Amino acid sequence: MANSKSAKKRALQSEKRRQHNASRRSMLRSYVKKVIAAINTGDHKAATEAFNAAQPIVDRMATKGLIHKNKAARHKARLNAKIKALAA
């Protein structure tokens, strides 16, 4: 438990950030799941549109520090590879 005034403030800030980051992380996962769902249906056009919507979100979360930039690149590369496999 926080005893000093500054420790209490930091605890409040930490909780606020945790909730904000959880919301952002949930949004990121939702966008990625939409792409995966479109891929699983086999609809190339829908998968491409979902990927085009998800790509800037993934990049933004990496820029904000929510996920590592390499993880963002890995997500995009794997999803794009699956979409290209649909077209083939």
UniProtKB/Swiss-Prot annotation:
Gene: rpsT
The keyword Ribosomal protein appears for this protein: yes
PANTHER family listed in its UniProt record: 30S RIBOSOMAL PROTEIN S20, SMALL RIBOSOMAL SUBUNIT PROTEIN BS20C
DNA damage recorded as keyword: no
Similarity remark: Belongs to the bacterial ribosomal protein bS20 family.
This protein's name: Small ribosomal subunit protein bS20
Gene Ontology BP, a term: translation
NCBIfam families (UniProt xref): S20
A GO MF label: structural constituent of ribosome
Alphabetical keyword list: Ribonucleoprotein, Ribosomal protein, RNA-binding, rRNA-binding
Function: Binds directly to 16S ribosomal RNA.
Matches recorded under InterPro entries: Ribosomal_bS20, Ribosomal_bS20_sf
GO CC terms of this entry: cytosol; small ribosomal subunit
Pfam family, one: Ribosomal_S20p
Sequence segments annotated as region (Disordered): 1-27
